[in-house]
Curated annotation (Swiss-Prot):
It comes from Eremothecium gossypii (strain ATCC 10895 / CBS 109.51 / FGSC 9923 / NRRL Y-1056) (Yeast). Belongs to the WD repeat MDV1/CAF4 family. Residues 359-375 have a biased composition (Basic residues). It is a peripheral membrane protein. This is Mitochondrial division protein 1. WD repeats lie at residues 409-449, 452-490, 503-542, 564-604, 605-644, 646-681, 685-715. It comes from the Eukaryota. Keywords: Coiled coil, Membrane, Mitochondrion, Mitochondrion outer membrane, Repeat, WD repeat. GO terms for molecular function: ubiquitin binding. Residues 122-147, 313-380 are annotated as: Disordered. Residues 347-358 have a biased composition (Polar residues).
């Protein structure tokens, strides 16, 4: 038998001893234990401590100041296991004689001795190693207490079947391994090996499932026997086996409780580490934000040639070395401020900054576009690959767990939302409300509100550097620097707005931006491409063919005042470099080349309006009012997969692992692309509070509902 199997048996035997002993002693009241007031054990222990049974005592050791030094020299403790050279030496100590030590260490109560089944049980019961009147007076109660729990012997006996079964199973596995090895060395086929394994597996399952009567008892003998003695013997044997099974059950229950305690401790440890990771990631976000601010300031200083390290150092040296009466020349400048970190901050000359600000404003008025803000956008794109950290805390939530909720974030249904990164910044908009609300996802609070649109905001996109572009029913596109609103919630909205694009003449229904390109779709049946370098429209694509016919000028002009829920002509747009994908009301997905402004491929299959789409390097996923999701292979232009829901699809996003869908139901639908399985998260599937909009990034999902609630989930 292997050492691992022997270790398991010893461990199981130890648990058996512990559990049985706890049942024996736990079944008796405190007054009935061997440590009761009149117990001989207590008397012997008292004699040992007070030196009644020996030449020295624990009390004398304590008074003399001698210390117990384990493993260094010969111990003067009551029990010295490590220096006992023989059985007699085991009972020798410095506190009592050998006889007293033997009585203390070998004492067994009458209740324990009475439990040993033997033909001489009566003699064992009457003969005691130590007797005292108090012990005899409690014999009856001890026997009554014994009826409530098993003995040590019974516990040992109960462990034998488990040990025997372990030995038998191990021997069978050894035989099977030898047989398989011999078969592999021979010319046997794989089918023969599989049959042998199946036979062994079947025999093992049969062994576990079969239940038999105790040894020596057969069902046919019981049914044909007329001997009361034999039948009573069978009753006693079966009763004893039931007692053993009860002990085995208690052992198993004890193991379950032990595992539960370990799992609870592991859960507590996991929660502590989880909170530690959350705190670390918040610190990372804090440092990343300041790192970006420093980079922006460096760019501004380089652009306007404001570098004055030499002048600043010279001014600092003069300020620190000049006499007190000569420091009046700096009275017009603020004193050196002490930062929270304890470092001294030297104020920059105000003249250069003021002239730079005037120059910046003048340049902005001349070009009609804030060059500084545009440079910020370009720099942000270049710094995408320089980001040092990225949040991963959402990966450690249980799938489908609610991370946070903003109840009644908007008075009406949420029309659109987007966030920069998990636990970062979220922007959202509601129906019939032109206000954009900004939320901190790590602190779970509202941090700013931005105004500027004249009507409902119908679409938006946000990058990971807090640049937001929105489109509304007022036919306007606006670019925002959300970081300004976060840093100062009282700042005027016109300072948060970087630029306004105003060439459309009807509601903006879809937009997408990437690098220096912005593409927008409108109810005026045009798609416009914008250059973010100068804010100008560089191309207009006409899509009148999407639905046939033309809209009247009056209908176009009054579009942003219309509050009906007609589905948009252009339902979804995404651009990447020179590639553009559009989904329109006719159910057709068109792939465009922005360099030529022409359609290079059409994907037909939806029977109703396309409301959402997204593509990567391999696939294009589209959602439609026909309740279906279609996955297209961009390499061949063919349909790779499709599935449907009970209600129309209004919004979707995907990555390599999952597709998340909003379809006017009370939950977010999730499709696992690897396992081909569907599941949902977020409340009641049949709730009237339907999910209107979803955004999903790296396992972090945010959804907006018809009642204005916003929730974040880990998937």
């Amino acid at each position: 038998m292997s050492s691992g199997t022997s270790g398991d048996q010893i461990s199981h035997f130890g648990k058996t001893l512990t559990t049985t002993a706890s049942l024996v002693f736990g079944s008796q009241s405190m007054e009935d234990t061997i440590l009761s007031y009149s117990s001989p054990y207590k008397k012997i222990l008292h004699d040992t401590i007070t030196s009644s049974g020996g030449t020295s005592s624990l009390m004398k050791v304590e008074r003399s100041g001698r210390m117990f030094t384990p493993f260094r020299t010969r111990n003067s403790a009551f029990q010295d296991i490590f220096h006992a050279s023989s059985g007699r030496g085991y009972f020798k100590n410095g506190f009592s004689d050998t006889r007293t030590s033997f009585q203390v260490l070998s004492y067994l109560s009458d209740a324990m001795l009475a439990d040993i089944p033997s033909s001489e049980s009566a003699a064992a019961t009457s003969g005691k190693l130590v007797t005292e009147k108090g012990e005899k007076g409690k014999k009856k109660r001890a026997e009554t207490a014994h009826a409530r729990g098993p003995s040590l012997y019974q516990g040992f006996e109960a462990s034998l079947p488990t040990i025997n079964q372990t030995i038998t199973t191990h021997q069978k596995k050894q035989i099977m391994n030898r047989d398989i090895k011999s078969i592999r060395e021979s010319d046997a086929t794989p089918e023969d090996v599989g049959q042998d394994v199946d036979i062994e597996k079947g025999e093992e399952e049969t062994t576990h499932d079969e239940f038999t009567l105790p040894k020596g008892i057969k069902p046919e003998h019981l049914s044909n026997s007329y001997s009361i003695k034999n039948l009573k013997g069978a009753v006693q044997t079966i009763t004893d086996n039931l007692d053993l099974l009860e002990i085995q059950k208690n052992l198993a229950a004890s193991e379950i409780r032990e595992l539960d305690l370990k799992m609870e401790k592991l859960k507590l440890m996991r929660d502590l580490v989880f909170r530690r990771v959350a705190k670390i990631e918040q610190n990372e976000l804090f440092l990343e934000k300041h790192l970006m601010n420093i980079r922006e300031r460096i760019d501004m200083i380089e652009e306007y040639n404001l570098d004055n390290d030499t002048d600043a150092e010279k001014a600092y040296e003069e300020a620190t070395s000049a006499p007190e009466d000569t420091k009046d020349q700096y009275s017009e400048l603020p004193d050196a401020n002490t930062a929270e970190s304890g470092e001294t901050v030297v104020q920059e000359p105000q003249v250069n900054l003021a002239s730079a600000q005037k120059s910046l404003k003048k340049r902005s008025k001349q070009t009609g576009y804030s060059h500084k803000n545009h440079e910020k956008k370009v720099q942000q794109h270049e710094f995408r690959h320089l980001r040092k950290t990225y949040p991963t805390l959402q990966q450690y939530y249980e799938p489908g767990a609610n991370i946070l909720s903003f109840d009644s974030a908007h008075e009406d249904n949420v029309t659109c939302l987007d966030f920069n990164l998990p636990f970062g910044t979220l922007c959202s908009a509601g129906k019939l409300d032109p206000t954009i609300k900004v939320w901190n996802l790590s602190k779970n609070k509202h941090v700013a509100s931005i105004t500027g649109h004249l009507a409902t905001v119908s679409c938006m996109q946000m990058d990971q550097y807090n640049t937001l572009i929105t489109g509304g029913r007022d036919a306007l596109l606006k670019m925002w620097d959300i970081q300004k609103a976060i840093d100062n919630d009282s700042i005027p909205s016109d300072e948060v707005c970087i630029y306004t694009f105003d060439s459309h003449i009807d509601e903006i229904t879809a937009l997408s931006f990437e690098a220096n390109n912005l593409v927008s779709g409108s109810q005026d049946r045009t798609i416009r491409q914008w250059d973010l370098n100068n804010g100008k429209c560089v191309q207009t694509l006409d899509i009148n063919f999407a639905t046939g016919g033309n809209l009247s000028r009056s209908m176009i002009g009054s579009g942003f005042l219309n509050t009906n829920n007609d589905h948009p002509i252009i339902g979804a747009i995404q651009c990447y470099d020179a590639a553009l994908a559009t989904g329109t009301k006719d159910g057709i997905v068109r792939l465009w080349d922005l360099r030529s402004g022409r359609v290079v491929r059409t994907l037909e299959g939806h029977s109703d309006a396309v409301t959402s789409l997204q593509f990567d390097s391999l696939n294009l996923v589209t959602g439609s009012l026909d309740n279906s999701i279609r996955i297209w292979d961009l390499r061949t232009g063919t349909l790779a997969d499709t599935f449907s829901y009970e209600h129309p699809v209004t919004c979707l996003q995907f990555d390599l692992n999952k597709i998340v869908v909003a379809n006017q139901e009370g939950t977010v639908k999730v499709y696992n692309r690897q396992e081909k399985k569907h599941w949902f998260c977020g409340g009641d599937e049949h709730s009237e509070n339907a999910v209107e909009y979803v955004r999903y990034k790296d396992g972090y999902l945010v959804e907006g509902r018809a009642n204005g609630d916003i929730n974040a989930w880990a998937i």
